Amino acid sequence: MPFSKVSGVNNAHKVMVYALSTCVWCKKIKQFLRDNNVEFEYIDADLCEEGEKARIREELQSKSGSLSYPTVIVDDKIVIVGFKEDNLKEALGI
C-alpha cells in the first residue's frame, strides 16, 4: 500500500495512520503527530485505487474490528480508533 512518511525526532514507535483526505478528525490526528514531532506513516484511503481500498478495508477490519477513520496503529499492537489525544499520548509516551 502507498503510505506517505512524515519524519519526526520522536521515532521510538512505529505509527501508522489510516485516514480519509476529507476527514476533519484525520487531519487533526496528523497535525497532532506533527506538532509533537512524531514520525509516522499515513494513507488517505479515499485517494487510493479500488484494489488498494479493498486491501485497506481488510487490514483495518482484521486489526481494529471496524472500518472507522481515523485509525492509528502503534507498534502493530495498539489500535486507537478516532482522535483520542490522551490515548495517543499514552501509547507514544508523550
Q: In which residue ranges do the predicted regions lie?
A:
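Local sequence-structure signature of Cys/Sec-based thiol-disulfide redox active-site neighborhoods
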Residues: P2-E41
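Structural signal for short hydrophobic segments within the conserved structured cores
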Residues: E41-I43, I78-I80
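A short, hydrophobic beta-strand/beta-hairpin element that forms part of a small beta-sheet core
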Residues: P70-V79
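Thiol-/selenol-based redox modules, centered on thioredoxin-like
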Residues: D86-I94
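Short alpha-helical
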Residues: V24-W25, G51, D86-N87
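Thioredoxin-like thiol-disulfide oxidoreductase module
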Residues: A45-S66, G93-I94
